[in-house]
UniProtKB/Swiss-Prot annotation:
Annotated positions binding substrate: K95, R130, K134, S147
Organism: Arabidopsis thaliana
BP-aspect Gene Ontology terms: chlorophyll biosynthetic process; dimethylallyl diphosphate biosynthetic process; isopentenyl diphosphate biosynthetic process; photosynthesis
Cofactor: Mg(2+)
Active site: residue positions: C146, E208
Chain segments annotated as transmembrane: none
SUPFAM superfamilies with a match to the protein in the record: Nudix (SSF55811)
Domain Nudix hydrolase, chain residue ranges per copy: 109-261
Lineage top rank: taxon: Eukaryota
Presence of keyword DNA damage: no
Name of this chain's protein: Isopentenyl-diphosphate Delta-isomerase I, chloroplastic
Length: 291
């Protein structure tokens, strides 16, 4: 049985997206936008592999022979931002090291991350199923986009959470083909932060301070199959049905641990604010919720 057949609501496969999914970004209401931020520069171009990263690739070839080539490149090219439990920057390391459970446990490696929750003008939430080639949590269903700000000038800006917003805009394009004009950085509303740890398998896992960003926009989608297997807009009730299937042990309906933490602790009350146009009232960026 296919994954899509398990749900009572429509799904959209990468190579057959329905035209109705896309609409002009002009329909977004300004009531959801936080105060305007200063214009920003485009994210810095990706650089070539460092000597350290190249050496790491060479040394781990035998251990990670089955890793997808794109994911392998990102594992060593991307430098995550290391933080302490108060979200203070303490350094940086490769995405590879930051997701090795051995490193996480031995060195308490903790990195900064973000999770985007994008709603359309009907207040439906866009979900994605992670691609089968993802190193951590392949083929699980999760929120719109989950990734990391990188250790680069434009994504280290602390003021107004601008660095994380810049990273979110970058990854929405990388994963879902959403152009920057459809998701202006000043329309992301940071609602909170949570600290969690979640092993994916015996080798890989997550240990993150995760920024939770909400945005209401109608966008055009062109998902990247290296990152995303499937996408789907869901209503609140449809999401509840999805959670029930996951709780029943349906192997084809697995949810990412960070998404489940947000669903269980925050999402439904925040969804109320989305529908009322009062989303900024829900923001609490002083607290780091340890879950």
């Amino acid at each position: 049985m296919s994954t899509a057949s398990l749900f009572s609501f429509p799904s959209f496969h990468l190579r057959s997206l329905l035209p109705s999914l896309s609409s002009s970004s002009s329909s977004s209401s300004s009531r959801f936008a936080p105060p305007r931020l200063s214009p920003i520069r485009s994210p810095a171009p990706r650089t070539q592999l460092s000597v350290r990263a190249f050496s790491a690739v060479t040394m781990t070839d035998s251990n990670d022979a089955g890793m997808d080539a794109v994911q392998r490149r990102l594992m060593f090219e991307d430098e995550c931002i290391l933080v302490d439990e108060n979200d203070r920057v303490v350094g940086h390391d490769t995405k590879y090291n930051c997701h090795l459970m051995e490193k996480i446990e031995a060195e308490n490696l903790l990195h900064r991350a973000f999770s985007v929750f994008l709603f359309n003008s009907k207040y439906e939430l866009l979900l994605q199923q992670r691609s089968k080639t993802k190193v951590t949590f392949p083929l699980v269903w999760t929120n719109t986009c989950c990734s990391h700000p990188l250790y680069r000038e434009s994504e280290l800006i602390e003021e107004n959470v601008l660095g994380v917003r810049n990273a979110a805009q970058r990854k929405l394009f990388d994963e879902l083909g959403i152009v920057a004009e459809d998701v202006p950085v000043d329309e992301f509303t940071p609602l909170g932060r949570m600290l969690y740890k979640a092993p994916s398998d015996g080798k890989w896992g997550e240990h993150e301070v995760d920024y939770l960003l909400f945005i209401v926009r109608d966008v055009k989608l062109q998902p990247n199959p290296d990152e995303v297997a499937e996408i789907k807009y869901v209503s609140r009730e449809e999401l509840k049905e999805l959670v029930k299937k996951a709780d029943a042990g349906d192997e084809a309906v697995k949810l990412s641990p960070w998404f489940r933490l947000v669903v269980d602790n925050f999402l439904m009350k925040w969804w109320d604010h989305v529908e009322k146009g009062t989303i900024t009232e829900a923001a609490d960026m002083k607290t780091i919720h340890k879950l």
